[in-house]
Swiss-Prot record:
GO terms for biological process: DNA-templated transcription. It comes from Lolium perenne. Keywords: Chloroplast, DNA-directed RNA polymerase, Metal-binding, Nucleotidyltransferase, Plastid, Transcription, Transferase, Zinc. DNA-dependent RNA polymerase catalyzes the transcription of DNA into RNA using the four ribonucleoside triphosphates as substrates. The lineage of its organism: Eukaryota, Viridiplantae, Streptophyta, Embryophyta, Tracheophyta. Its main location: plastid. The keyword Metal-binding applies. InterPro entries: DNA-dir_RpoC2_beta_pp (IPR012756), RNA_pol_beta''_euk (IPR050254), RNA_pol_Rpb1_3_sf (IPR042102), RNA_pol_Rpb1_4 (IPR007083), RNA_pol_Rpb1_5 (IPR007081), Rpb1_funnel_sf (IPR038120). Its cofactor is Zn(2+). The gene is rpoC2. This is DNA-directed RNA polymerase subunit beta''. Belongs to the RNA polymerase beta' chain family. RpoC2 subfamily.
Length: 1466
């Protein structure tokens, strides 16, 4: 009884770790047998209690946490603030994602802690609580998802979804939450399935490598060891784990007293003595050397002492134990059980999450300010850092609370601040951050609204995308999207589009656009003028397209004023990009309505051209040769080319009309083989001008569509890709490179051309045809279910791989009596119809005769007789009939010529689109001048205002040289910053460059075309630079005082330089090289709505200024419509202006909430109008972008909602859950290179191999080099693998991993340097075998260390039977047979395969005879020590040589004491 009274009575709950401790103490105290008896009683007790308690589980037992409501509210408020900061442009997208994930993760974790205390206080016998927290079933995180909140989920890529699931499973999820939840859950299910297979295969490979490793001897006699010391940043726990169960490699002294001898195994008692010794004298304690499998000298087995204690009991491992297989299974097995942390997968946390300290109640907080230092949190918010533990008091109404805050925490509140209950007052940094594998991730940011892009810093052009639109930001700055309202209409009297912009006015299908013709133009005298109501007629689809290097401006003509002219000419003027015209450039064209195709549809155009010298043949010469020549001229080239459209005839019209941009999909090809260059003969403009593209005028007034055509080889191969030609496709529109110039040399004249109707349908393979091949049909016959023929005639069907072609040839067929006499492919005029033909009726039209062959009977020919429409070319059209003649006075040196072009190539099929007309002939105006004059002309648009009328002129003038307004362009190839990505200062808007003004006055002669805005003037007129007076932004001799007066009236403006002028009533002539202005902020000179007149006085007339990118001020018409509601007026009072030192200037970008003039700016934006008492801000959205981010797009480019703006590259920590963890372990074992092995191990080994022999400079160099290399890589590999497992909380003893790593690194490759008689170069041999062979032969063998993966190691063992049973059986056996290999059956697997006794087990010793090697042990040790001392002297002399790789040389001295001392780190 007395004994029992002295026993300690423990009265507390016991959990898993407590149970572990109890069992290990029982084993130490009583041994294995008795312990198992005690544990049996425990088990019985447990089952008895569980049965009597009879725990049941109901949904009522899931208690929700009361504090959840305000916690979630708190987190939502933080998220809202975050969103707001993002909106202001204070943080960037990646930062927002990180913080939001952190906020919700912290909330979720705090809820989890609350849950534990909640259960403990309210219902300690709750079955859910009992089950999960006793470790019986379930864990805290599962219960947390049931009663707390589900928290953050990861998507399948492992990226965090920043919308948290706030509900728990007890409350039920909303639809969105359910979908997000499925993401994470599905990932979990897939991972579980995948990891089982992965882990199983990993185990198999590991066991394969080490199955032959057995404990065969007591001691191998090594004197080497690995040093372990707690000073090297190793935690105490890790230190204990590493030491227990090992054997000492050297005696250990404290002072002069030896406390442990060599070859003694280390138990818990010894470890505790070490730790106390280290604590007492941390600096004097020497590292402890232990034996490991690495240091064992045996090749294919291991000795007792190098292995240490058995994992099962506290004694040395027994001889005959198969430790290799145990090791393989110990590593592979946890892989199947590693916990899956689904909700942590986002891995956005770089450290552990911080613990938050919350205020216990409302009250005033106080702490000693001297103990804290101001700093910032990792999110940039101000905070205080306390270096020592801080005592904080909170004074509520009647109670004084005190809170202790540990050192190195951040205080998030001010002293004497009033805090609310549960407010976060401090943040405790988590301990050592867990291991995270970093990876670089790209995040794309997309624009949230339409707008124009600006940035507030210089950018680099990324050199690899020299001509692309990607830029790199050299420093953190804002990108701005300036608001633009969605309407892209052609309200402007003529449209000048920026590069690549598309303008639509919507056709009848688009009803959502209201009628813009109600918008009126503000005229100075106040009368209203409707702009182009004609655009809004039904069924007008207009698409103006700015091509790569020219502008298109339609000239509108009004019918009632043009009786003597051709009605409804749509003249389109094209101005090249830089405004420079070369000789013989076409700068305007229009379409003559007489050469328009009628609505009959598609067909073939035929003509013959004659050179200018050729004499015109009259039609009366009806000789037989005439027919011969005709036949040759007009022979169809059917074998070479036919036509087919990309138009899907069977598509629904909805698709076509839905989006006007898709309607015109034309693919042309210049058949260069036939015609040389596109400009060679008769200069077809078809390739270049894309017909109706880009001539808005003709489309809106003359309703006809484009020609669609495509070449198709008749031969079986598919049509060629358009890449071969110089046409390229962009955004559904075709552009063509090259300028439209042609030379007179090749020009042919055409006297007449013919149009022969023909129809082509491209049908899908699947469609069933209602007509037969070679049959004759009438008009409007049904061809397929929803296609009808437009022509009557002969049907030809041809089936291709992807589609079916159906051609209809108009006309009748005729069977001649004698097949030979029929001529194929000739045209017959109306007078000479064949009398003997069976056609009795006489035709007034020309007839085209085509010879066909019926496929079925080879002899029978027939002739297809097809009507042809003849068009005569009109030679008489000239400038006089085009324009009123009296206004045109041609100068000597600039001429305009009129040229007609046929828009189609000879014998080509042209396809009709829907119910539209198409044009055959296009008339062009060509500008030309004498050869010896200057080589270039400049074109510009001029606006002249006089007497309330606005007139626009196209001015063409000769230019001396381009230097006057283009400086040297920036060199695009250099990667230096381009200032604001601008082209260059002077060439953007040369109206403001002095040089250009001089060049204007030098050339008085110029042709100007009037682009009429007012019905009174439609004409071409001459305008010379001297006729106009410029009043504007530079001092003019005629009005020297203009600007000064204005500046006197508005004193503020002097700060900002000239901000535009209010125009005197006489005239304002401003010639702006529109073509050169690349980026400008633009404003409509329209009054938007009547009732806004008062508010937006500022928008009226010309009382405002606009700026372009280069801070130049200008007044322009534009295509960007600014919505008045996007503009905010800020009134600036003089007094407030003087008080605040804020200086604003045009174009300044201001973030929301910036304090200017005593009031906050309510919206972010750009100042772009400054008045006397106010300024106008154009709404804009800032996006913060960090250094190195890539910007997509150009400065001033218009982006639409959803376009990609910026790409961030940021590092995120890879989550170390199983999906990333197991593969990492596997990669290391397989010796594949992975990013997070900081320097690649393979490379590190190479370096060592090269360096060490050079440093040591002795014949043993290779041996030492290889050994040091192998030692170094082994240590680093073990650490890497342990990190992955420890991060998952899995404990694996180091020696299991060491046994496997030893096999992976035990081979060296014989190098070619020294040819040895024993091994062939490139052969893999064991390191020890190489050493022994070297000693035996007395010559050095050259080899280098290599790292084999576990698979390769399994295929490089000494037993070919083991290899063959693993992989590649046939290959391994064949090789072994050819080489005559012998298998000594040393391992387990070989014996199992052959059915022998396996050489393991405790009876093993009887088979083993003592080897004579043991007797020589002492002598060897002596020799080793001799070598060690020599090495030490050598290294002492050359310390600085070795210090290049610090990792190892720190310990180099000890390395050779007991030779190996690399260090384990946690």
């Amino acid at each position: 009884m007395a004994e029992r009274a002295n026993l300690v009575f423990h009265n507390k709950e016991i959990d898993g770790t407590g149970m572990k401790r109890l069992i290990s103490r029982l084993i130490d105290h009583f041994g294995m047998g008795y312990t198992s008896h005690i544990l049996d009683q425990l088990k019985t007790l447990g089952f008895h209690q569980a049965t009597t308690t009879s725990i049941s589980l109901g949904i009522e037992d899931l208690l929700t946490i009361p504090s959840k409501g305000w916690l979630v509210q708190d987190a939502e408020q933080q998220s809202f603030l975050l969103e707001k900061h993002y909106y202001y442009g204070a943080i960037h997208a990646v930062e927002k994602l990180r913080q939001s994930v952190e906020i919700w993760y912290a909330t979720s974790e705090y809820l989890k802690q609350e849950m534990n205390s909640n259960f403990r206080i309210t219902d300690p016998s709750n079955p859910v609580y009992l089950m999960s927290f006793s470790g019986a079933r379930g864990n805290a995180s599962q219960v947390h998802q049931l009663v707390g909140m589900r928290g953050l989920m990861a998507d399948p890529q492992g990226q965090m979804i920043d919308l948290p699931i706030q509900s728990n499973l007890r409350e039920g999820l909303s639809l969105t939450e359910y979908i997000i939840s499925c993401y994470g859950a599905r990932k979990g299910v897939v991972d579980t399935a995948v990891r089982t297979a992965d882990a199983g295969y990993l185990t198999r490979r590991l066991v394969e490598v080490v199955q032959h490793i057995i404990v065969r001897r007591r001691d191998c006699g090594t004197i080497r060891g690995i040093s372990v010391s707690p000073q090297n940043g190793m935690t105490e726990k890790l230190f204990v784990q590493t030491l227990i169960g090992r054997v000492l490699a050297d005696d250990i002294y404290i002072g002069s007293r030896c406390i442990a001898a060599r070859n003694q195994d280390i138990g818990i008692g010894l470890v505790n003595r070490f730790i106390t010794a280290f604590r007492a004298q941390p600096f004097l304690a020497q590292p402890i050397y232990i034996r490991t499998p690495f240091t064992c000298r045996s090749t294919s087995w291991i000795c007792q002492l190098c292995y240490g204690r058995s994992p099962t009991h506290s004694d040395l491992v027994e001889l005959g134990e198969a430790v290799g297989i145990i090791a393989g299974q110990s590593i592979g097995e946890p892989g199947t059980q590693l916990t899956l942390r689904t909700f942590h997968t986002g891995g956005v946390f770089t450290g552990g999450t911080a613990d938050l300290v919350r205020s216990p109640s409302n009250g005033k907080i106080q702490f000693t300010e001297n103990l804290v230092h101001p700093t910032r949190t990792r999110h940039g918010q101000p905070a205080f850092l306390c270096y020592i533990d801080l005592h904080v008091t909170i004074q509520s109404q009647d109670i004084l609370y005190s809170v202790n805050i540990p050192s190195k925490s951040l205080i998030l509140v001010q002293n004497d601040q009033y805090v609310k209950s549960e407010q976060v007052i401090a943040e405790i940094r988590a301990g050592t951050p867990t291991l995270h594998f970093k990876e670089r991730v790209q995040k794309h940011i997309y624009s949230e609204s339409d707008g124009e892009m600006h940035w507030s810093t210089d950018v680099y052009h990324a050199p690899e995308y020299q001509y692309g639109n990607l830029r790199r930001l050299p420093k953190t700055s804002h990108l701005w999207i300036l608001s633009v309202s969605r309407c892209r209409s052609s309200i402007a009297s003529f449209s000048l589009h920026k590069d690549q912009d598309q303008m639509n006015t919507y056709g009848k299908k688009d009803r959502e656009i209201f009628d813009y013709s109600t918008l009126v133009r503000i005229m100075p005298n106040g009368h209203w003028n409707l702009i182009y109501p004609s655009i809004f007629k039904e069924n007008s689809d207009l698409l103006a397209k700015k091509r790569r290097n020219r502008f298109v401006i339609p000239l509108q003509y009004h019918q009632e004023q043009e009786k003597e002219l051709i009605s409804c000419l749509g003249i389109s003027i094209e101005i090249p990009f830089m405004g420079v015209l070369h000789r013989n450039t076409i700068f305007a064209y229009f379409d003559d309505p007489r050469y328009r195709k009628d609505k009959k549809g598609s067909g073939i155009v035929k003509f013959r051209y004659r050179t200018l010298e050729e004499e015109y043949r009259t039609r009366e010469e009806d000789s037989e040769d005439e027919y011969e020549t005709l036949e040759e001229e007009y022979r169809t080239r059917e074998d070479e080319y036919e036509y087919e459209t990309l138009e899907d005839e069977y598509g629904s019209p909805e698709n076509e009309y839905g989006n006007p941009e898709n309607e015109y999909r034309t693919l042309e090809k210049d058949s260069e083989d036939e015609y040389g260059s596109p400009e060679s003969k008769y200069g077809t403009l078809e390739e270049d001008s894309e017909d109706d593209y880009g001539s808005p005028g003709e489309s809106s007034e003359d309703k006809y569509g484009t020609l669609e055509e495509d070449l198709e080889e008749e031969s079986e191969d598919e049509y060629e890709s358009p890449e071969e030609d110089s046409i390229f496709k962009k955004e559904g529109l075709i552009e063509h490179r090259g300028t439209k110039e042609f030379s007179l040399k090749y020009q042919k004249e055409v006297d007449r051309f013919f149009f022969i109707l023909q129809e082509l349908h491209i049908l899908p393979r699947s469609s069933s045809l209602k007509v037969l091949d070679n049959s004759i049909i009438g008009v409007d016959t049904q061809l397929t279910k929803n296609t009808r023929s437009r022509l009557g005639g002969l049907v030809r069907v041809k089936r291709k791989k992807s589609h079916t072609e159906l051609k209809i040839f108009s006309g009748d067929i005729h069977f001649p009596e004698e097949a030979d006499k029929v001529l194929g492919g000739c045209l017959i005029p109306p007078e000479r119809q064949k009398k003997d033909s069976k056609e009795s009726k006489k035709s007034k039209n020309w007839v085209y005769v085509q010879r066909k062959k019926i496929i079925k009977s080879k002899e029978k020919y027939f002739v297809s007789i097809r009507p042809a429409v003849a068009y005569e070319m009109d030679e008489g059209r000239n400038l006089a009939t085009l324009f009123p003649q009296d206004l045109l006075q041609e100068e000597d040196n600039l001429q305009l010529r009129l040229v007609n072009f046929i828009s189609h190539e000879n014998s080509k099929l042209t396809q009709r689109i829907y119910h539209t007309n198409s044009q055959f002939v296009r008339t062009c105006l060509v500008v030309n001048w004498e050869q010896e004059k200057k080589e270039k002309a400049g074109a510009s648009l001029v606006e002249v205002r006089a007497n309330d009328l606005i007139r626009d002129f196209l001015r063409i003038e000769l230019i001396k040289c381009t230097i006057s307004y283009t400086r040297k362009r920036y060199d695009r190839t250099s990667a230096g910053p381009i200032p604001h990505n601008r082209l260059d200062h002077t060439n953007l808007n040369s109206f403001y460059s002095k040089a250009k003004i001089e060049s204007l006055s030098q050339h008085q002669e110029a042709i100007g075309t009037l682009l009429n805005r007012n019905k009174e003037y439609q004409s071409l007129m001459i305008l010379s630079a001297s006729n106009c007076s410029q009043i504007g932004l530079f001092k003019n001799p005629k009005h020297p005082n203009t600007i000064k007066e204005l500046n006197r009236r508005i004193p503020i403006r002097e700060i900002f330089g000239p901000l535009g002028v209010i125009v005197p009533s006489i005239s304002n002539f401003s010639s702006s090289y529109y073509l050169l202005t690349h980026n400008k902020i633009l404003l409509k000179k329209y009054l938007f709505l009547d009732n806004l007149k008062q508010t937006f006085q500022v928008l009226q007339g010309l009382k405002y200024s606009l700026i372009d990118e280069n801070k130049r001020i200008s007044n322009f018409d534009s295509n960007i419509m600014l919505d008045p509601f996007l503009l905010n007026c800020h009134f600036v009072h003089h007094d407030s202006w003087e008080e605040t030192s804020a200086i604003i200037h045009l174009g300044q970008l201001i973030c929301e909430n910036v304090c200017l003039f005593k009031s906050h700016i309510k919206k972010s934006g750009q100042i772009f109008i400054i008045n006397m008492d106010s300024f106008v801000i154009r709404a804009a959205k800032p996006y913060l972008a960090t250094t190195g981010a890539t910007v997509n797009g150009h400065y001033g480019e218009i982006l639409y909602k959803g376009d990609r703006l910026v790409t961030f590259i940021y590092e995120k920590s890879r989550s170390s859950d199983i999906t990333q963890g197991l593969p990492k372990v596997e990669q290391i074992f397989e010796a594949r290179s992975i990013d997070s092995l900081s320097p690649n191990l393979e490379r590190r080994i190479e370096d060592w191999n090269e360096r060490i022999p050079r440093i040591l400079g002795i014949p043993w160099g290779f041996l030492i080099g290889a050994e040091l290399t192998i030692a170094q890589s082994r240590i680093s590999l073990v650490n890497k693998i342990q990190k992955v497992y420890r991060s998952q909380g899995v404990q694996i003893h180091n020696r299991h991993i060491e046994i496997i790593i030893r096999q992976v690194t035990s081979k060296v490759r014989v190098s070619e340097d020294g040819m040895s008689n024993v091994f062939s170069p490139g052969e893999l041999i064991g390191l020890l075998r190489a050493e022994r062979a070297g000693r035996a032969l007395d010559e050095s063998i050259y080899y280098r260390a290599i790292l084999l993966g576990i698979t390769r190691a399994s295929l490089n063992t000494q037993s070919f039977i083991s290899e063959a049973s693993f992989q590649e059986t046939a290959r391994v056996l064949a090789k072994a047979a050819l080489r005559g290999r012998i298998d000594w059956l040393k391992g387990l697997k070989e014996n199992v395969v052959l059915g022998g006794i396996i050489p393991v087990g405790t009876g093993f010793q009887k088979f083993v005879h003592r080897s004579p090697q043991d007797k020589n042990l002492y002598f060897e040790i002596q020799k080793q020590n001799l070598f060690a001392s020599e090495m030490r002297d050598f290294l002492f002399l050359h310390t600085e040589l070795v210090s290049s790789d610090s990792d190892i040389t720190n310990n180099f001295y000890e390395t050779l004491e007991p030779p190996f001392t690399p260090i384990y780190t946690s």
